[in-house]
Amino acid sequence: MDVMTLATIPSPPQGVWYLGPIPIRAYAMCIIAGIIVAIWLTRKRYAARGGNPEIVLDAAIVAVPAGIIGGRIYHVITDNQKYFCDTCNPVDAFKITNGGLGIWGAVILGGLAVAVFFRYKKLPLAPFADAVAPAVILAQGIGRLGNWFNQELYGAETTVPWALEIYYRVDENGKFAPVTGTSTGEVMATVHPTFLYELLWNLLIFALLMWADKRFKLGHGRVFALYVAGYTLGRFWIEQMRVDEATLIGGIRINTIVSAVVFAGAIIVFFLLKKGRETPEEVDPTFAASVAADAVASPDGKPLPKAGEGIDGETPSTR
């Protein structure tokens, strides 16, 4: 065994465990963990902007199932050759636990669901979008760990020290099962861990969004526009490294084209949107009024923080 082999990144021996007859899938656990973290962070950020944090959980109940459905639909459409061919089983298109979610489908359908929800609540969408943007990119990073367990979304073979080992996995009958099987210990190939590249990129964009939001006091949807631009920039170059089967348009992977188009659109939208940040009264006037009333009625005589105070050490008057 040489030094390069010692330096490679091992894949997990399996991505599915069983609790009796119930399968526990690492891919699903990573998605759930990402959702939980996103809800927690969004509650803090939305409350700091002056919104009612309880709205976040309500929005998540609407957005999460819509996002998962949208993500799966986008994946099946853009990777239809995996489900609709002479040797394919179309029923596999519904087996979401085997992996396969397209982020753009999740953002579009999940975003539409949230937009309808906020319209029903008669609240502006932009402050929530800005609050949720860093949380979404962080959740995406956590979710990418699921690709590691599934041994999917990797790049070309390589001998770099951080190459990922892809194991030969088999099911209980000894048949090849790269996603649901258990490793035999045989290394089929060492490849570029593109899932890891995207995970690290997502964490970088998360940090940049948090910094930019604090430094420039962004609002009116500009944080969300930056999230879209940042993610698509990374997805554009990472997509070039992937070798998994994908739909091509003019010899170019469809997600490469989508990333380029969406990146350009996000940059344009960012500069068109209004500068500055909304006041708590603009974010949720009813909640802001109730917080102000509670502050006046504080039993110990000490005024409570107003809605929106605390974000980046600001008060409404300094925005």
Curated annotation (Swiss-Prot):
| Subcellular compartments | Cell membrane
Xref: Pfam families: LGT
Could you name the Gene Ontology cellular component terms for this entry?
A: plasma membrane
Question: Which InterPro entries does the record associate with it?
Answer: Lgt
Q: Which GO terms describe its molecular function?
A: phosphatidylglycerol-prolipoprotein diacylglyceryl transferase activity
Pathway(s) where this gene product acts: Protein modification; lipoprotein biosynthesis (diacylglyceryl transfer)
Q: Which PROSITE patterns match?
A: LGT
User: Could you tell me the superkingdom of the organism this chain comes from?
Assistant: Bacteria
Output this protein's name: Phosphatidylglycerol--prolipoprotein diacylglyceryl transferase
| Organism of provenance | Corynebacterium glutamicum (strain R)
As recorded in Swiss-Prot or TrEMBL, the protein's gene is named lgt
